[in-house]
Amino acid sequence: MSDTVLVLDCMNIFIRCYAANPKMSSHGHHIGGTVGFLKTLRGVCNKFSPTKIVAVWEGGGSSRRRSIHPGYKKGKKPKRMNRFYEDDIPDTEKNKNLQIASLISLLKKLPVCQVYVGDCECDDVIGYLCKYTLRNENKVIVSSDQDYYQLLNEKTKIYRLGKKEVVEAEDVIDLTGVSCENYCLAKCLVGDSSDSISGIKGAGFKSVAKRFPVLTTDKEADLMQIFEAASANIDKKIKLYREIVDNFDVVKRNWRLIYLDTSNLSADQMDQINHIIDTFEPTRNKITLMRELIKLGIQNLDVEGLLLSMIYVK
């Protein structure tokens, strides 16, 4: 069996569970985010038998991205609670933060390396891990965030929780119409409304794939290739070409926002990431874990099954 690193997009997983799982503690508090996360963790561990688990938390957002685009992620709406239970479960920041704090504490009793780096986004940390720190390891990113498509290669896969499916590099063209090598570039043209990133008027994945066939190949294109191709066709009736040429500053800005590499991380932040990974020692503290679950009022969680799912972690 080859070694596999599970890379968890923690907030992505937690928010899914928090919004959908109505589980209440014996103290009468909503605890579905915490319980759902642990059950999800057990499930993906059983599926992939990881030898290492890296759980990446949001670090408060990227000031570098906000300096590039002040409207970045502005007004992003949080997921609502499961509507069937809305009247009974308080959907509050306080409850959510308490659940996250509880989850972080519980994960410390498990062989899970938690990574938190201030003033940067989870996406950037995962991008750095995949491209540099863990570049030679087989990795499975657990997230529903499509931004990670740009990281896919023979060493990196994505497990989409919602659809319970594995996405590999060759799958991206069927899912989006463009290759994983050019997904980021295509998204710079299309934009990302969920993060308040405007794109080029009339640009969608289907249309940019049609007008710029290089985006469908496994050869990585660059910004200037798109600009030159659009300029060469600017006199044609298709408006998309002129829109790209006239608004190319938007495309360049979007590249700085969407591309996952080291550009939005400082040297100190990269050192922090490497230090956390290099110095982590896995632990399995069953008794302390069970005591904390009792204290939190979390009942009927299969601790044995959770620990057994991580049997290969070293």
Regions found by a protein language model. Name each.
Residues 2-142, 148-166, 259, 264-279:
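Noncatalytic, basic helical substrate-engagement surface that gates or grips nucleic-acid strands
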Residues 100-101, 144, 184-189:
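Intrinsically disordered, low-complexity segments enriched in polar/charged residues with Gly/Pro
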